[in-house]
């Protein structure tokens, strides 16, 4: 046959006629590929943006705008004469030399180093105990362990404040019974007393995270380990604990952030503790609150808040990177 030809399928009104021979030139001319790209119009699907729009609006106005405004305020100073004036990095230079600020930071850092490991250890033990399925009344035990987290922090602190009272609380009753003179509000042990309140409040929450991670482990692994003669401790050490790495990283990050934001407990106990054991700069958040609402230094408080946010983010990011490296090993 003269010229290049190709077998094609001619479609007319929905009917197909196989075997029809068309010249290659004609076939190419009728091909959809010959249409210019400009004629192909892609419709933009806006449904995803419609669903995401409310979240973006709330996120911008609740998170982005306050952070940007705090950064903006931190570059100004409030003066008796002249009002609010631009000061550049003066607030940050003042903060570096502020001993009250660094004392409060060191206090919450010590609080974090002691309280967070103790709390997470107790939460892991409770999660392993519930996951063992050997406890009587397991559902009741799980609910009662989580219940303190449902109690508002203000109420929890007030309850523990009355328990700690050496004259009117449980500690006072024990002192009268045993003839002792325990004082939980002593400045030397006050930080540990606050840590006990936080541990009581958040152990159940972290326990639930650990228990959720344990509950997704296939039971076939336990059965295979039992057939191989593994003991309960070996199952915990070789199967359960490695599965807690991901949830452990999450709980550590959340706990560090919460510890550096310590405010409710010392602020409420301040009026219950005799003397001046809890000062207005006991924690960074209390110091920022005092500067902003009592000392009329909101711009300096904004600089303090920005620095604390940077410190907390750096620590949380370090923990996350370390966790990812351990997971990839």
Each predicted region: which residue ranges?
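A structural signal for multi-pass alpha-helical bundles of membrane permease subunits
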Residues: 44-329
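Transmembrane alpha-helical segments of polytopic membrane transport and secretion proteins
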Residues: 1-52, 135-139, 320-329
């Amino acid at each position: 046959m003269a010229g290049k030809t190709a077998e094609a399928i001619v479609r007319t009104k929905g009917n197909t006629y196989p075997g029809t021979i068309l010249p290659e030139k004609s076939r190419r001319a009728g091909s959809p590929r010959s249409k210019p790209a400009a004629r192909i119009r892609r419709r933009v699907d806006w449904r995803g943006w419609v669903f995401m729009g409310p979240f973006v609006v709330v996120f911008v106005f609740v998170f982005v705008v306050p952070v940007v405004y705090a950064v903006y305020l931190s570059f100004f100073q409030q003066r008796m004469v002249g009002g609010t004036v631009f000061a550049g990095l003066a607030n940050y230079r003042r903060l570096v030399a502020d001993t009250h600020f660094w004392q409060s930071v060191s206090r919450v850092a010590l609080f974090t180093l002691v309280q967070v490991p103790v709390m997470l250890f107790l939460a892991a033990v409770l999660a392993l105990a519930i996951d063992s399925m050997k406890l009587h009344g397991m559902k009741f035990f799980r609910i009662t362990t989580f219940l303190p987290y449902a109690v508002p922090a203000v109420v929890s602190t007030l309850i523990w404040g009355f328990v700690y009272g050496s004259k009117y609380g449980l500690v006072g009753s024990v002192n009268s019974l045993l003839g002792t003179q325990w004082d939980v509000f002593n400045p030397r042990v006050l930080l540990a007393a606050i840590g006990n309140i936080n541990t009581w409040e958040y152990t159940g929450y972290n326990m639930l995270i650990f228990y959720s991670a344990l509950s997704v482990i296939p039971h076939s692994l336990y059965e295979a380990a039992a057939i191989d003669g593994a003991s309960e401790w070996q199952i915990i050490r070789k199967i359960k604990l490695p599965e807690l790495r991901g949830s452990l990283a999450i709980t550590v990050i959340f706990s560090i952030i919460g510890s550096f934001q310590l405010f409710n407990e010392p602020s409420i106990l301040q009026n219950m503790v005799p003397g001046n054991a809890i000062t207005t700069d006991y924690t960074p958040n209390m110091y920022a609150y005092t500067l902003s609402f009592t000392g009329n230094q909101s711009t300096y408080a904004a600089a303090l808040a920005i620095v604390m946010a940077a410190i907390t983010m750096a620590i949380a990011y370090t923990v996350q990177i370390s966790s990812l490296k351990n997971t990839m090993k």
